[in-house]
Amino acid sequence: MEVIAENRKARFEYFILEEFEAGMVLLSSEVKSLRERKVNISDAYVTEKNGEIWLHNMHIAEYKAANKKKHKPKRERKLLLHKKEINKLISQIKTAGVTIVPLSIYFNDKGLVKTRIAIVKGKKLYDKRATIKQREWNRAKSRLSKNNL
């Protein structure tokens, strides 16, 4: 599994309730840009339209060597999931305070582009402070253990 992009902001901004793996419908120039790692998913989110799941606001830079089949960098991209997963996501989207965001994009073992999406709930400011405090404490512990060895 070769990770192309990761949404680190999502793990800080949200509580992750459940994760899914989804395929994406892409154009050839988009895949080539992904191989060059020219993608940004920090502001991306997932919505439902006509019983299908769509990824919005993901920026894939234009592939410079593409002649005719250039793509729009921020176009909507359809996500491929099983019907049972789609129904679960649609029911969660309608819940107040819950959203769906991509966590990472990667090439699987077969060379297909996959995205890991998650059902998330927003953190309050005090939750974010607690996360920072815990992270700093873990760093301090590791420094102390290195110095004691």
UniProtKB/Swiss-Prot annotation:
GO biological process: trans-translation
Localization, UniProt: Cytoplasm
Underlying gene: smpB
Chief location of this protein within or outside the cell: cytoplasm
Known role: Required for rescue of stalled ribosomes mediated by trans-translation. Binds to transfer-messenger RNA (tmRNA), required for stable association of tmRNA with ribosomes. tmRNA and SmpB together mimic tRNA shape, replacing the anticodon stem-loop with SmpB. tmRNA is encoded by the ssrA gene; the 2 termini fold to resemble tRNA(Ala) and it encodes a 'tag peptide', a short internal open reading frame. During trans-translation Ala-aminoacylated tmRNA acts like a tRNA, entering the A-site of stalled ribosomes, displacing the stalled mRNA.
RNA-binding recorded as keyword: yes
Originating species: Wolbachia sp. subsp. Brugia malayi (strain TRS)
A UniProt-annotated Pfam family: SmpB
PANTHER family tied to this protein: SSRA-BINDING PROTEIN (PTHR30308:SF2), TMRNA-BINDING COMPONENT OF TRANS-TRANSLATION TAGGING COMPLEX (PTHR30308)
Any one cellular-component term (Gene Ontology): cytosol
The protein's name: SsrA-binding protein
Recorded superkingdom: Bacteria
Keywords on record: Cytoplasm, RNA-binding
GO molecular function: RNA binding
Family, as annotated: Belongs to the SmpB family.
